[in-house]
C-alpha cells in the first residue's frame, strides 16, 4: 500500500502520534499537508474523517488521494517540519462503534431477508443504512434488529486482517471489491467476513 503510512491499521485506538510533513498544498482554498504517517482516518465508505489537531491547527477534513496519500486539511498553515497529531478520541470511538454496528446490521438483513446494503451514511446525530429490498414488513425489520442485537450481546471479538489481491478469491465475500489491490477484511466470526477496500 503506497502513500501515507496508516497507523490506525496497526492500532485503531491510537490517538496521538508524531509525523513528518512530506508535502504542503491547499484543498478548496484551505492549507493542507500530507504526512509520512498518520493516525487520522480519512472519509471512506460512509464513515466520516477523524477530527482533531495537527501541530495545534484544527483538522477540517481528512481525505485519501488517488495516489494513496492522506491529505489533512487544516484551519491554518502548519508550522515546522514535524507535527504532533491528536485525534479526537470520543469521536473516533463513536465512529468505530457505528461502523461495526453497520456491518452487523447489514449482515442481519442479508442473513434473514437477502437484503443487500446499498449505502451507509454516518452522521453526528443519526446514521442511515439503505437496504435493497422491494418491501419489508415491520416484523421483518424487528427480526433484523433482534438478530443484530443478539450478535452485539454475544460480545464477539472483531478481527481485522489484510488479503493480497491474488488471494481475494479465497475470501467468502458477498460482492467483489470495488478497488484493486490489498483488501482489508473484518471478521466477527469465522464464517462471516466483511470486506473493506483500503
Map each language-model feature to its residues.
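A glycine- and charged-residue-rich anion-binding loop/surface
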Residues: 1-198
Amino acid at each position: 500500500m503506497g502513500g501515507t503510512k496508516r497507523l490506525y491499521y496497526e492500532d485503531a485506538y491510537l490517538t496521538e502520534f508524531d509525523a513528518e510533513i512530506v508535502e504542503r498544498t491547499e484543498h478548496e482554498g484551505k492549507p493542507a499537508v500530507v504526512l509520512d504517517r498518520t493516525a487520522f482516518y480519512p472519509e471512506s465508505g460512509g464513515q466520516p474523517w477523524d477530527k482533531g489537531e495537527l501541530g495545534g491547527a484544527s483538522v477540517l477534513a481528512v481525505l485519501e488521494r488517488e495516489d494513496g496519500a492522506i491529505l489533512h486539511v487544516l484551519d491554518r498553515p502548519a508550522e515546522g517540519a514535524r507535527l504532533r497529531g491528536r485525534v479526537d478520541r470520543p469521536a473516533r470511538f463513536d465512529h468505530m462503534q457505528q461502523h461495526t454496528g453497520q456491518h452487523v446490521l447489514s449482515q442481519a438483513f442479508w442473513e434473514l431477508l437477502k437484503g443487500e446494503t446499498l449505502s451507509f451514511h454516518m452522521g453526528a446525530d443519526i446514521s442511515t443504512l439503505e437496504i435493497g429490498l422491494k418491501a419489508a414488513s415491520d416484523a421483518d425489520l424487528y427480526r433484523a434488529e433482534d438478530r443484530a442485537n443478539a450478535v452485539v450481546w454475544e460480545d464477539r471479538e472483531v478481527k481485522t486482517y489484510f488479503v493480497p489481491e491474488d488471494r481475494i478469491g479465497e475470501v467468502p465475500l458477498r460482492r467483489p471489491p470495488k478497488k484493486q489491490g490489498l483488501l482489508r477484511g473484518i471478521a466477527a466470526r469465522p464464517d462471516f467476513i466483511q470486506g473493506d477496500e483500503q
